Amino acid sequence: MATFARMVKGQVRYYSAPLDMAIPASKQKYIPASGTYPKGFSVSGTHVGVKASNTRFPDLALISSETPCSAAAVFTTNKFQAAPVQASKNTLKATQGEGIRSVVINSGCANAVTGKGGLEDAVSMGAKVDECNGLAQPSTLVMSTGVIGQRLPISKILDKIPTAHSTLSSTHDSWLTTARAICTTDTFPKLLSQTFTLPSSPNRTYRLAGMTKGAGMIHPNMATLLGVLCTDAPIASSALQPLLKHAVSRSFNSISVDGDTSTNDTIAILANGAAGGAPITSTSSADYTAMQNVLTSFAQSLSQLVVRDGEGATKFVTVRVQNSPDYESARLIASTIARSPLVKTALYGKDANWGRILCAIGYTQGVAEGTVVPERTSVSFKPVDGSAELKLLVNGEPEQVDEDRAAVILQEEDLEIVVDLGGGEKGEKGLGGEEAIYWFCDFSHEYVTINGDYRT
């Protein structure tokens, strides 16, 4: 098939990154009309033609700082780690997360399972950016996304990197174009930005921006896709890594589209300190706590855009597991529900089949003993309109479900599933108040069609 995009019941799914995406009307609201971007960072999106079928759309993204950055990243746990993952890990290890200047990303080819030659290609991409920055030492992180098992057209990419560097810009349009350049089957670019303050400098404004991509092969086991976060706050790399790890565990590590973990998953953050102020160096400082809250909330909002763009998805579902003795057990239960094909297909079919949710809770592996007790487990649907929860199961006893109300709730795009492991208010029956939240989407006919045609 020679066409660049495939239409699936109104969803245009691109297999490289189009500049003039036919974004579905329902997704237009997620595209920012403006932004507040961190000082000292500039970006570009450039056409290379990584895939032969892409004759004009940007598929090479470059994010660069005028000054050296502290950097941190989290990577996929898939055993078949892609060449760019290996290259970026090596760069961070060699630099100890200091002095990083850029991130370069191509879409259209994952450069995964490509052997020694693939690793050399990834290293050469970073080296070419370093050359453009006038640097001899490795200072660029590399990411790739696309089809696994194919070599990059590396000569074409290396030839275009100087163009990408010469067109770096800090405008909103440039940030949006760059976010578009990393898309594959995404139906819209995923870009957010915000301002914040820190306790030590209450009158100083800091900025945080981030872009991510992903719509399929999304289920975390340390990261879930590609993402780059940039801030002009001063943060030492020793503090940046735990900040990112915490944020990812409660955001990109808490989403699922289809239960698959990619070979290329990488989330990176760069902090250049361009806004000034006292550097965050201690994990026990007030600034660190404030930054942790800002970064985690921001990462949650950014990661949720991936779920909202899940391949073939018609629903955005929050599953909240509460009244657990520990966070990890609650997270495992939420994760199991989120990746259950039976739960996901029931939601697509607008079927209030709570038995499938209960089944997923019951077979969850790795939870602390005594966490799941049928006689104190409750399940309910929580409507987005703020009305009362629809109770499905209370203390292990099924409720007489109002099917008409259930149908109304399930008709909505957004839905929350609440699982209470204590059967009542937090803290009852000797349990703690630990809670975990996961975000996921449903499974539809379109998901099968999209992925059945992925390489065509």
Swiss-Prot record:
Site (Cleavage): A223, T224
GO cellular component: mitochondrial matrix
Keyword Metal-binding: no
InterPro entries linked to this entry: Arg_biosynth_ArgJ, ArgJ-like_dom_sf, ArgJ_beta_C
UniProt keyword list: Acyltransferase, Amino-acid biosynthesis, Arginine biosynthesis, Autocatalytic cleavage, Mitochondrion, Multifunctional enzyme, Transferase
Active site residues per record: T224 (nucleophile)
Gene Ontology biological process terms in this record: L-arginine biosynthetic process; ornithine biosynthetic process
Annotated transmembrane regions: none
Subunit structure: Heterodimer of an alpha and a beta chain.
Protein name stated in the entry: Arginine biosynthesis bifunctional protein ArgJ, mitochondrial
Species of the source: Aspergillus niger (strain ATCC MYA-4892 / CBS 513.88 / FGSC A1513)
